[in-house]
Design a protein with these regions (language model features):
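Conserved catalytic alpha/beta core of Sir2/sirtuin-type deacylases, generalized to analogous enzyme cores
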Residues: 1-300
């Protein structure tokens, strides 16, 4: 791997000379921005829940089988508040906008914290594939209306009692079928892909197609292997198959490159890069350094 400064300068040149930039963002970007799901931030906001349920972080606690809707929404209201509704724009996302705002860019993200919108990215250039904490939906997906949840979240937090339950009358129920509601997050086949979702999906896919033969830079931030089929695997394929494309991957621990061979994905760590198809490493820039430090250097 080239030196840090060499990679930064190469990336600087690619940003300046590329016709299009596609940003792919996963949880690692928000973690780098300070929206951590564990550690002191988790302990600060969820001390009572940790004491009652032995929670260890916000990711695993999201799968906890609460015994009642009153308990479930006491937790989720605080989770949604801390990570979206009452979480302002972060500096790192703002710097990322500074880096690309004068370019023809598009964002695809699996994050549900709305940081791209809060930080001033053009909403018409963002596709949030997995939903948003800022809305709730019918858990049975009986209809495709989504509901803003900010006022509901604040009232739940205000009225959560010592047993970490909200009043029964606050529990949201679907206005159509009368069943329970859930945060608007992709968890199963009940996730609602409404008209707006499909508009954003089409806009992203059209952007990719229109850029196919142009010089295009893929910037992938903090994407792991929870849902690699959305960003990571396609980015590797685009970079390998589209002649004028380049990929910069920012990841503290996963810089592997994936190659689809007869329908099966094979991962190649950097130390095995010599086994990759010829030319791949000429268009692949891996970074395991601090994301904000890299962006700061690019903005100099």
């Amino acid at each position: 791997m080239e030196s840090f400064n060499e990679r930064v300068e190469k990336l600087r040149n690619l940003i300046e000379t590329s016709d299009h930039i596609i940003i792919g963002a996963g949880a690692g970007l928000s973690t780098a921005a300070g929206i951590e799901y564990g550690g002191e931030r988790f302990k600060k906001h969820f001390a009572d829940f940790i004491k009652k349920y032995d929670f260890t972080d916000m990711y695993t606690s999201g799968f906890y089988p609460f015994k009642s809707e009153e308990e479930k929404w006491a937790y989720w209201a605080l989770h949604i508040s801390v990570n979206n509704v009452d979480m302002p724009a972060t500096g790192l996302y703002g710097k990322l906008l500074d880096l690309v705002e004068d370019k023809d860019y598009f964002v695809i993200t699996t994050n549900v914290d709305d940081q791209f919108f809060k930080s001033g990215f053009d909403p018409d250039r963002v596709f949030a594939t997995q939903g948003t904490y800022a809305k709730i939906q019918c858990a049975n997906a009986c209809h495709d209306t989504l509901y803003d949840d900010a006022d509901f979240v604040h009232e739940c937090i205000e009225k959560t009692d010592a047993d970490l339950k909200i009043p029964s009358e606050l529990v949201p129920v679907c206005p159509v079928c009368g069943r329970e509601m859930m945060p608007y997050l992709r968890a199963d086949d009940k996730f609602i892909e409404d008209e707006y979702w499909h508009e954003r999906s089409d806009a992203y896919n059209n952007f990719v197609l229109d850029a196919k033969y142009d010089k295009t830079l893929l910037l992938e931030f903090g994407v792991g292997f929870n849902t690699p089929i959305i960003i990571r695997l396609p980015f590797d394929a685009y970079n390998m198959n589209f002649k004028n494309w380049n990929l910069a991957r920012f990841n503290r621990s996963h810089l592997e490159y994936s190659v689809n061979i007869e329908g099966r994905y094979h991962l190649y760590p950097l130390e095995a890069s010599s086994r990759l198809p010829e030319g791949i490493m000429d268009s692949y820039l891996p970074f395991d350094e601090d994301m904000e430090c890299i962006i700061d250097k690019l903005l100099e």
